[in-house]
Amino acid sequence: MNLLSKISLVMAAAMLSASFSPAQTQDPESGTASSKKYAVVNFSVNFMREQPEYEAELVDHALMGTVVEIVGKKDYWKQIVSPEPYKAWVNDMGLVEMDGDQLDQYIAAPKYICTAEYSHVFARPNRNAERLSDMVMGDIVRIWYRSNGEGSNIKQTKKNQEMFLGVILPSGRKGYVPKEDLEVFSEWAQTRNATVGNIIATAKLFLGVPYMWGGTSIKAVDCSGLARSVWFMNGILLPRNASQQAKVGDDIDFHPDYSISETSDEFKTEMKKRISYLKPGDLLFFGKRATADSKEKVSHVAIYLGGGKYIHSSQIVRISSLIPGDPDF
């Protein structure tokens, strides 16, 4: 499936501007009608769990700056719906609640996106200053001032203006981020170009990142989280799970010979035949074929690099081979 040429481009701005139509909903505690509640993710990565407890299964990550809807509450946990949409529970310290007007103002505000793998927000324009927050690739914050000082209400030295950018966290706290770690979001979104080279280069930034079920950030990723993160940073918004990702784009039209045993000498030749149909940048899906008694099941996804190699998240993000007999097969 060659997503680069087959699926329509959905700019990452959808993650920010995704909104929920104003309506009335039931208050999760009182059961009475109330206005819908919204929030913006305030942690660099907020862990989304199946149930309101730390022992519950991790199902997704929500990155800083993502707009969510609050649909439930239990103790210090909030049940949210993310733009995907994905419903899960998060720690309420990682959210900044907003009403409709506040949300409109937030969405309209100019923003930066973190394009470095990792960064920090400092209390002063100095790398040795107190750290207000960490940041990861894909995090979004509002612009306080730009490198030319525009928007700043405090006096900055020329050196600091050149080295740091002023940001406003979702909580409203103001801080400073090294200039090279951020880009103006609107300009970044307009320049995304999901070429094969860009996809592969972004994927390789994740090499060595640990596997985590439900992970979708450079801190830790599962297989579909890797694919989703890579395409997001190149301007394409993929579905969250591998089984959903397998339904977008076009299937590769080839006819593998499944009668050949994987332990036979002929299997290597068969695999090379299958590989000949692939192009770098294709998504590869692994799982079980449909039978008379069961449906097809997709359980893993990887990104094809070319030459029989692919990159995927399995224990860690690593490069493996499709060719039987290779050390990394």
Can you describe what each PLM-predicted range is?
Residues 24-36, 66-67, 82-113, 117, ...:
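Boundary regions of SH3-family modules and the immediately adjacent low-complexity/disordered segments
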Residues 203, 215-234, 238-241:
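Active-site nucleophilic cysteine motif
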Residues 31-34, 40-70, 114-155, 211:
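Beta-loop motif signature
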Residues 128, 185-190, 210-218, 291:
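Second-shell loop/turn segments in exported
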Residues 239-319:
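...with weaker cross-activation on analogous glycine-rich loops/strands in unrelated enzymes
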Residues 8-18:
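Bacterial N-terminal signal peptides
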Residues 97, 119, 126-132, 295-329:
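Aromatic- and glycine-rich peptidoglycan recognition patches
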Residues 1-9:
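Bacterial N-terminal signal peptides that target proteins for export
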